[in-house]
């Protein structure tokens, strides 16, 4: 949040907060670390000439104490630790257990030094408030947990030693402070801790997931489908026994017969029909098991689960299934968290209701049926625009950088309208609902814009031909139809325009 400075150096800013919250004022210059509370009004004075800092308000004692006696802590993240202590760089996934534990010992020492300095300060200034002392002690603990959990990205095979995690759990997580909004680092600490715990949990068996929700009545199976799922595991076990002692060719034949059988066909049809419901049910199940494992209360449980659903909608760009919304309304009691999910869900519900049937920007792919070779598929798609410079954008609705780039589509079209171009967007692994919603949301439309959402095998064939290895990927085709070996990334518009000028000569 920011506000313009008046001529006399004043500013006014309103910040929405749920609870007592740590904030940084004048970020990038003064880095003032303080606390604000909902419903309160504060007057901040920062005299850059004299160095005097003062907070006035209904209850501003803690803020003034923090400014007069700021935190004294020397925590190093892993990269800084290796740079300044070992004079070397550290790569992701490279640290052996011994090295991880050495870093833990270093951080423990830093924490002890910070606590000792605080003890000394209390002796020197015995009238410091209990709130100030508790705030700093808990800040040091939360900050320590956040730094330590970042180590998971540097540990060998991304696995932390048990003793390391035991320390984090007992000395940091078990001592976490409330409200959870109090410290900025609590968000990173919680996310990293929960995600790491979640990585150690086994996935939910898909067959069991379907049967469980069928029993609950949250999904509906026909009697034939239900029987197929109930029989599936037994049939798999029979297959396992049947292939024992068989030759490789015999095993291959038995497995192919099983996979091509009616039972597997019935099961796969259900998975396809209920893919959104099952994916969302698995997400909820995983979130619930993580929160149970870390023994957190209802507030964190609701927040973490709602956050997972919010991120899912944001990533998929499509609304949740009806059964998921019913579960959310029934089980998430934290009103703020539930309302955030429902608001985002309604946004994509509204986008999904938009009529896209007459859009000329969604290209027909009927003429591609039966074509399997990547170059041939691509040539067929771009055939109507021969003679134009064509920018190909290979993207996915699940790809955040792709969607970020699409926010600026109209700026791109306006800048390049003098160069007689066509913009072709090829979606990777994106459901039709998500695909259309993203196009609508970011207005990725225009006279010279086309979108295709090919079947997986055809999209893969085109990407193999183009040698796609990241998303988004951009490719340029000149007026003669040649695929150019150039950096065609339009996110740097100035460089891209210069490239198109050269190509168009």
Question: For the regions a protein language model found, what residue spans apply to each?
Answer:
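Short Pro-Gly-centered beta-turn/loop motif in secreted/extracellular proteins
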Residues: 6, 12-21
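Thiol-based oxidoreductase modules, predominantly thioredoxin-like and allied folds used
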Residues: 419-434, 444-458
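Conserved redox-active cysteine motifs that mediate thiol-disulfide chemistry
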Residues: 386, 394-411, 428-430
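Short, internal strand/loop/helix patches
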Residues: 276, 439-471, 477-479
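Oxidative protein folding and maturation machinery
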Residues: 57-384
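A short, solvent-exposed beta-strand micro-motif common in secreted/extracellular proteins
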Residues: 19-29
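Thiol-/selenol-based redox modules, centered on thioredoxin-like
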Residues: 476-505
């Amino acid at each position: 949040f920011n506000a313009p400075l008046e001529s006399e150096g004043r500013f006014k800013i309103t910040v929405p907060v749920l609870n007592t919250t740590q904030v940084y004022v004048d970020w990038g210059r003064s880095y003032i670390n303080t606390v604000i509370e909902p419903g309160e009004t504060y007057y901040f004075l920062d005299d850059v000439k004299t160095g005097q800092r003062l907070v006035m308000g209904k209850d501003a004692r803690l803020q003034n104490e923090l400014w007069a006696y700021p935190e004294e802590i020397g925590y190093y993240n892993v990269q800084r630790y290796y740079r300044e202590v070992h004079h070397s760089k550290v790569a992701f996934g490279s640290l052996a257990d011994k090295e991880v534990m050495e870093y833990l010992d270093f951080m423990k020492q830093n924490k002890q030094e910070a606590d000792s300095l605080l003890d000394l300060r209390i002796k020197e200034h015995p009238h410091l408030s209990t709130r100030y002392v508790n705030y700093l002690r808990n800040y040091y603990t939360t900050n320590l947990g956040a730094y330590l959990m970042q180590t998971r990205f540097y540990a060998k095979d991304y696995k932390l030693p048990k003793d390391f995690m035991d320390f984090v759990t007992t000395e940091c997580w078990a001592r976490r402070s409330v409200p959870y909004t109090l410290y900025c680092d609590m968000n990173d600490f919680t996310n990293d801790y929960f995600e790491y715990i979640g990585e150690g949990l086994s996935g939910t068996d898909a067959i069991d997931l379907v049967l469980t929700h069928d029993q609950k009545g949250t999904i509906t199976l026909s009697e034939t489908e239900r029987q197929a799922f109930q029989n599936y595991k037994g049939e798999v076990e029979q297959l396992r026994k049947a292939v024992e002692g068989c030759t490789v060719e015999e095993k291959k034949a038995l497995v192919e017969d099983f996979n091509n059988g009616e039972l597997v066909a019935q099961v796969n049809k259900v998975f396809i029909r209920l893919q959104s419901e099952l994916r969302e049910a698995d997400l909820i199940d995983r979130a619930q098991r993580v929160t149970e494992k870390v023994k957190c209360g209802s507030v964190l449980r609701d927040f973490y689960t709602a956050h997972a659903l919010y991120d899912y909608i944001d990533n998929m760009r499509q609304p949740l299934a009806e059964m998921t919304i019913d579960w959310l309304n029934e089980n998430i009691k934290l009103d703020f968290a539930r309302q955030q999910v429902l608001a985002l869900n309604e946004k994509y519900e509204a986008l999904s209701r938009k009529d896209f049937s007459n859009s000329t920007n969604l290209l027909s792919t009927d003429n591609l049926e039966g074509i399997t070779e990547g170059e041939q598929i691509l040539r067929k798609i771009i055939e109507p625009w021969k003679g134009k410079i064509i920018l190909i954008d290979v993207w996915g609705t699940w790809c955040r950088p792709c969607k970020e780039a699409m926010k600026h589509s109209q700026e791109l079209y306006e800048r390049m309208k003098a160069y007689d171009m066509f913009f072709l967007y090829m979606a990777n692994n994106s459901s039709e609902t998500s695909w259309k919603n993203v196009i609508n949301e970011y207005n990725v439309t225009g006279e010279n814009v086309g979108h295709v959402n090919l079947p997986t095998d055809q999209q893969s064939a085109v990407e193999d031909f183009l040698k796609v290895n990241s998303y988004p990927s951009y490719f340029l085709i000149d007026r003669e139809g040649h695929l150019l070996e150039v950096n065609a990334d339009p996110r740097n518009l100035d460089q891209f325009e210069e490239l198109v000028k050269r190509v168009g000569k």
